[in-house]
Amino acid sequence: MSSAEEKLFMKALKEKFEESPEEKYTKFYIFGGWKQSERKKEFKEWADKIVEERGVPHYNPDIGVPLGQRKLMSYQVSGTDVFVEGDDLHFVNNAAMQQMWDDIRRTVIVGMDTAHRVLERRLGKEVTPETINEYMETLNHALPGGAVVQEHMVEIHPGLTWDCYAKIITGDLELADEIDDKFLIDIEKLFPEEQAEQLIKAIGNRTYQVCRMPTIVGHVCDGATMYRWAAMQIAMSFICAYKIAAGEAAVSDFAFASKHAEVINMGEMLPARRARGENEPGGVPFGVLADCVQTMRKYPDDPAKVALEVIAAGAMLYDQIWLGSYMSGGVGFTQYATAVYTDNILDDYVYYGLEYVEDKYGIAEAEPSMDVVKDVATEVTLYGLEQYERYPAAMETHFGGSQRAAVCAAAAGCSTAFATGHAQAGLNGWYLSQILHKEGHGRLGFYGYALQDQCGAANSLSVRSDEGLPLELRGPNYPNYAMNVGHLGEYAGIVQAAHAARGDAFCVHPVIKVAFADENLVFDFTEPRKEFAKGALREFEPAGERDLIVPAE
């Protein structure tokens, strides 16, 4: 076991509190209340201006429970040297977090092969690399809001939609050589050789267009709009580039083929009780989110980091934006998410588990059996609980029982997935960790937090009609997962842990994995935590701003 100074979280604990991390006693009511926070003082100054201008009350930190009775601690963004205030990790205060979701929501992938077949067989058009390049030129005019077919059509200012474009993905290397470089997401260039081979083989000779709609449209409309926006501009661009007459009988077939036949959304439509269309957070499966994150191609030999970056992205999207805002609202559930991507506590636990597994079994070399699940999950859970007991500062950092339960279980689940290369085994390791934790501490958190964990083992080891999906295909709307914070992002990380251990280039969909390797995306999906830190420091430059059409100040 590593010494205290070697713990990955020790630097953060020493920065956060004046006392030694091992100290059992602290002080209260001596820190100056909310005024100990520079950010809250800034908030109060702004609120006072707003109240003076409009005469209606606004933010007032003296309302409600007095803030600052305890130390208002800083947070170290895990995997970085950046310390920030907690307020800067609320997604409304963090432009990078917003852009991560914007870049996922505004992405729609549409296969081109069916449309090409209809063009050739029903409309008598020739499809060549040259015509594909011409079509892509047209689409990159139309997608950001340019008119292509009719006169007297209003258009959108390019400065508002500068982040909007379309590119091509193909596993056909001969075709890839003929596609203009500015339109191609080049698999061989962007991925390590072994991963590139896997992706090219999985995609085969199929061709896809990746459409990135304008961020600003997502701010005004919803995720389902992206699918419709892409469909309309694709159809108009095909009609223009291939000079299709609107009155031809086959055009209706072509319209379906080009707009709807091969659509890949990032999120599926939710049922009426959730009332959300495609490309909203509640419909994004865990495996799809894992494929959006690109850490695996940058750090292929570090499965722990790969899993941790996915957990961070998932916790932000599922806990902060989906459950914390769409399903709850207001201040939301920020600190359920921050527990897994700040202060290096989860990092310490996950790397401990990786080392344990590597020494005892080898990475992805153990059979996915209950014996392995019990061994690995128990070892890592007990290690995590011991750290909380040994270092009260870690307990204060994760002041909620459900935060600690999520962190221990995430480490146990990822470690089990590292051992077996199997996400279902990893999920069962998560469930076992929760049960062990409850036995040790009596409870896990708020009432109902552990609902899905109490009944989860049965449906992680068998396939049942309504509850038996493999973890890769489950998502926030899966039965029992629909309103439980501190779980969903970690599940995505367990998926990634299994596939990273196996050396897989993707978790669910090779085309989605390649789509998010695109270097023109605003958010850097190889390093979500570093991007969150930039957002917290107010150094991240987002898309979707309206400066061009508002008065200059």
Swiss-Prot record:
Its EC number is 2.8.4.1. InterPro entries: Me_CoM_Rdtase_asu, Me_CoM_Rdtase_asu/bsu_C, Me_CoM_Rdtase_asu_C, Me_CoM_Rdtase_asu_N, Me_CoM_Rdtase_asu_N_sub1, Me_CoM_Rdtase_asu_N_sub2, Me_CoM_Rdtase_Fd-like_fold. The keyword Metal-binding applies. Coenzyme B binds at residues 259, 273. It catalyses: coenzyme B + methyl-coenzyme M = methane + coenzyme M-coenzyme B heterodisulfide. Coenzyme M binds at residues 336, 447. MCR is a hexamer of two alpha, two beta, and two gamma chains, forming a dimer of heterotrimers. GO terms for biological process: methanogenesis. Its cofactor is coenzyme F430. Pathway: One-carbon metabolism; methyl-coenzyme M reduction; methane from methyl-coenzyme M: step 1/1. Keywords: Cytoplasm, Metal-binding, Methanogenesis, Methylation, Nickel, Transferase. It holds the Pfam family MCR_alpha. One of its GO terms (molecular function) is coenzyme-B sulfoethylthiotransferase activity. Component of the methyl-coenzyme M reductase (MCR) I that catalyzes the reductive cleavage of methyl-coenzyme M (CoM-S-CH3 or 2-(methylthio)ethanesulfonate) using coenzyme B (CoB or 7-mercaptoheptanoylthreonine phosphate) as reductant which results in the production of methane and the mixed heterodisulfide of CoB and CoM (CoM-S-S-CoB). This is the final step in methanogenesis. It comes from the Archaea. Coenzyme F430 binds at residue 150. GO terms for cellular component: cytoplasm. Binds 2 coenzyme F430 non-covalently per MCR complex. Coenzyme F430 is a yellow nickel porphinoid. Methyl-coenzyme-M reductase is activated when the enzyme-bound coenzyme F430 is reduced to the Ni(I) oxidation state. This is Methyl-coenzyme M reductase I subunit alpha. It is found in: Cytoplasm. Its main location: cytoplasm. Belongs to the methyl-coenzyme M reductase alpha subunit family.
